[in-house]
A protein has these predicted regions:
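N-terminal localization/anchoring segments of enzymes in phospholipid and broader phosphate metabolism
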Residues: 1-265, 270, 274, 298, ...
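A short, conserved beta-strand element enriched in hydrophobic/aromatic residues
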Residues: 199, 282-283
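A short glycine-/small-residue-rich loop at the edge of a beta-strand within enzyme catalytic domains
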Residues: 259, 283, 287, 314-321, ...
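Helical hairpin unit composed of two closely spaced alpha helices linked by a short loop
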Residues: 285-307, 311, 316
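Short glycine/threonine-rich loop-to-helix capping motif typified by GTGT followed
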Residues: 294, 320-324
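Active-site donor-binding acidic/aromatic loop of nucleotide-activated sugar
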Residues: 337-341
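Catalytic-core elements of nucleic-acid end-processing and repair enzymes
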Residues: 348
């Protein structure tokens, strides 16, 4: 059946075509790689892997703000959205037509009235139960351009297994947001279906936002036949004068089931293998391959402090039971697993040896690592 799935083959060709036009627009920033290799070689090797295999470069000249709660990210996001002058791009796995989204929509409508271009992109399956089928029409009626990824149609469609799990906001090509949270009330603890909700995110300002822009445009253009040769790519991807206060390096990257490279998993495994002192993760689901299990256990056997935080209250009991089934095999080799008892930990993060970290959408979960469209940020300091 997989071999006969012409829809998936067609999509692979389409993504390859769009990437061949978009990704070369990013600078290769070889001087940044050279500086990292001189100062933190183990991090430089991972940055080189990402750049060679996903074509997303490493940047400096970018300030990063970390949010330890999703609502803090939302509040900052609302402030930045209200300042938009040219364009706003938003891509999320789930949007709920409720309080949190209404705060965003109010600002988007105001910006549209002063000439700001606004594009919204969401995953249909991820938003089922959150919005009605007329959501796109409602957005278009107020001047907000809206597209849906892979609309759900009952029947045999193997491509339905590939969902858009990315979470990105880009404002004027200068400010960007990503992390674990979607645009639904539960993520901001406006509602509490699973106790307290724990999520994290980051705000970028500076050169690295270009990569988030490319990631958004890839998905936006992939779902419309007429946009593969969009002549307007250049007006959204540009360098502007910005002087960052921070001196670290950041590398936004994307992972896709439309190629044969599992960038998200390889970055995690590489970080684990490079760890010398500690390697810590937060993930809502823990359903991992033998390769990752081996890497985690081997690191613990080397004396690395390996810790994984998972939820104390699950959103899906069946998946929770599978997650817990991995505990014994890890713990017996020295990996420490903690459950976040106040509620559901949805954050997707890692930090290694005080010099490397990731934040984004990629879970320690087979679906996330192999089947979904994902994005992350690799950070070095």
């Amino acid at each position: 059946l997989i071999g006969l799935n012409g829809g998936t083959h067609k999509m692979r060709e389409r993504y390859a075509e769009i990437d061949s036009k978009l990704l070369p627009m990013l600078s290769d920033n070889q001087e940044c790689l050279s500086r990292i290799n001189e100062t933190i070689p183990k991090a430089g090797n991972i940055a080189s892997y990402i750049q060679r295999n996903s074509q997303y470069p490493i940047y400096q000249n970018t300030d990063v703000m970390y949010f330890d709660e999703a609502v803090k990210g939302l509040e900052t996001q609302l402030e930045d959205l209200a300042k938009a002058q040219k364009f706003i791009f938003m891509e999320y796995h789930a949007i709920e037509d409720a309080e949190a989204w209404h705060k965003i929509q109010k600002i988007l409508e105001e910006r549209v009235k002063v000439g700001v271009e606004v594009r919204i992109f969401y995953d249909d399956m991820g938003s089922i139960g959150f919005i009605n089928t007329d959501f796109v029409k409602k957005m278009e009626c107020v001047g907000i351009h809206c597209r849906v990824f892979n609309p759900f149609v009952p029947g045999l469609n193997l491509f339905l297994n590939n969902r858009d799990h990315r979470k990105i906001t880009v404002i004027d090509g200068k400010v960007g947001f990503t992390g674990g949270y979607n645009l639904a009330n539960e993520y901001f603890n406006y509602t509490h279906p699973y106790g307290q909700w724990k999520d994290t995110g980051i705000r970028l300002e500076g050169d690295a936002v270009q990569s988030l822009t490319v990631t958004f445009l890839e998905m936006w253009n992939a779902v419309s036949d007429k946009d593969a040769n969009d002549p307007d790519f250049g007006k959204y991807i540009f360098h502007y004068d910005y002087k960052a206060q921070q001196t670290g390096f950041i590398q936004p990257y994307a992972d896709s089931p439309m190629d044969n490279e599992q960038v998200g998993e390889e970055v995690y495994i590489s970080m684990i293998n490079k760890a010398e002192k500690y390697c810590w993760f937060m993930t809502p689901y823990l359903i991992i391959t033998d390769e990752m299990t081996h890497a985690l256990c081997l690191a613990a056997k080397r004396g690395v402090d390996v810790r994984i935080i998972t939820p104390g209250i699950p959103d899906k009991k069946f998946i929770y039971n599978i997650t817990r089934s991995f505990y014994h095999g890890l713990v017996k080799h020295g990996v420490r697993v903690y459950e976040w008892t106040p509620g559901f930990c949805h954050a997707k993060m890692s930090v290694v040896d005080d010099c490397m970290a990731t934040c984004g959408t990629i879970n320690l979960d087979y679906r996330s690592l192999y089947h979904h469209f994902e994005n992350g940020c690799f950070m070095i300091d």
